[in-house]
């Protein structure tokens, strides 16, 4: 009996209640987590000449940790998933052209402590009829928030943007 009590006391001593250290500003679409903040600045509908569709989301990231972070890793820590209806969207890698691989650029981008960088990520979509929802979470804690992006009002990027010959 004494051992059970000690175990219970030990467990309760080991798991102090943590206050969530995050905030979400719905108007600014800004999620501030414990080591980083992610803001959705804009989104653009894009389509390749072959008819592949994607949504290009422009993020503003800031690193409040003490370590330099890879931009993409930081983004993936805070952006839990991006969905259309209930379908999870995949990051569109090389959907358009090798010259325009935003995700590779995002992967190479390093964000030093206290630094702010903007990166752009493309998400492959089946159509532009269903809105996008971006779920934020602070590193697997219970904290979460959802940003809704209506694709109806988005600008569409000109197709020539993806033509390798067009400069």
Question: Across the structure, where does each feature detected by a protein language model lie?
Answer:
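The feature marks short-to-medium sequence segments in extracytoplasmic or secretory-pathway proteins
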Residues: 49-51, 62-115
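Low-complexity, acidic Ser/Thr/Pro/Gly-rich terminal tails and inter-domain linkers that flank the onset
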Residues: 18-51
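C-terminal motif of bacterial Sec signal peptides marking the signal peptidase cleavage site
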Residues: 9-13
């Amino acid at each position: 009996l004494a051992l059970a009590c000690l175990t219970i006391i030990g467990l309760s001593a080991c798991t102090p209640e943590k206050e969530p250290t995050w905030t979400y500003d719905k108007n600014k679409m800004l999620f501030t987590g414990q080591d980083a903040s992610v803001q959705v600045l804009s989104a653009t509908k894009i389509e390749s000449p072959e008819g592949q569709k994607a949504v290009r989301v422009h993020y503003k990231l800031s690193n409040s940790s003490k370590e330099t972070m890879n931009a993409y890793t930081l983004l993936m820590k805070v952006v839990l998933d991006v969905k259309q209806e209930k379908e999870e969207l995949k990051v569109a890698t090389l959907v358009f052209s090798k010259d325009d691989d935003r995700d590779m650029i995002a992967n190479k981008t390093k964000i030093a402590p206290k630094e702010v960088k903007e990166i752009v990520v493309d998400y492959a979509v089946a159509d532009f009829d269903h809105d996008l929802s971006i779920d934020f979470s602070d590193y697997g804690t219970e904290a979460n928030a959802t940003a809704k992006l209506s694709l109806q009002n988005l600008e569409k990027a000109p197709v020539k943007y993806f033509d390798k010959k067009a400069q």
